[in-house]
Amino acid sequence: PARIVDEVSVGPQLGEENIQAGFSSFVIALAVILLYMVFYYKGAGLVSNLALIANLFFLIGALASLGAALTLPGIAGIVLTIGMAVDANVLIYERIREEMRGGKGLMVAVKDGYSKAYSAIIDANLTTLLTAFVLYSFGSGAIRGFATTLIIGIFTSLFSAIVWTRLVFFSRLENKKPISFYTDMTKNWFTKINVNFI
C-alpha cells in the first residue's frame, strides 16, 4: 500500500518564483566566487574556476541520470557543494603559498602543498558526508533531496579539487609553463596576521 512520507502544497506561481529566486542567488554567488578566485589567486584561481565549472557539470549530470528534479533544497545543496569545492582549493593553494614562502621551488611546493592539505580536506568532507548520510537516512522529502545533492556533490568536489586541479598543475609544470598563485596585490595578504585565540 502507498504511504505518504511528505506532502507540501505550493501554488504554481509561488513555486516558480521561489525556484527563480533560488537560481538567481546561485548564479550571483557563483559569479562572485569566480571573480574573487581569479582576483586573489590569478592563474591558479582560473584553474580552480575551471575545476568548479567541471564539478557543476559532474554534479548536474549525476543528478540528471538519477532523474532528480530541481528544487530549492537541491539548489541549496549545489550552493553548499560549490562552497566546499572552493574551500578545498583554498586549503591547497594557501598550503602551496606557504611552502613557496619557505623557499621551496614551484614543483616541490605544489607537491607538498597537495600532500599536506589532503588530511584537512578529507576530514572536513568526511564529517559532512556522515552528516548527509544521517539526513538521508532519517529525513524525508525535501531533506532527502538536499542530502542526495550534498552526498553526490562531496564526491564530485573531492575529484575536481584533488585530482583534476593536480593534473592541470603538473601538466603545466612538466611542460615548463608558469603558474601564479597570487597577484602583486594579494601576494602578502594575511601573511602577518597572528590571532591569539587563547
Where do the protein language model's features map onto the residues?
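Extended, hydrophilic extramembrane loops/domains of integral membrane proteins
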Residues: 1-6
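Short helical (or helix-break) motifs at transmembrane helix termini and adjacent helical loops
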Residues: 81-100, 121, 158-163
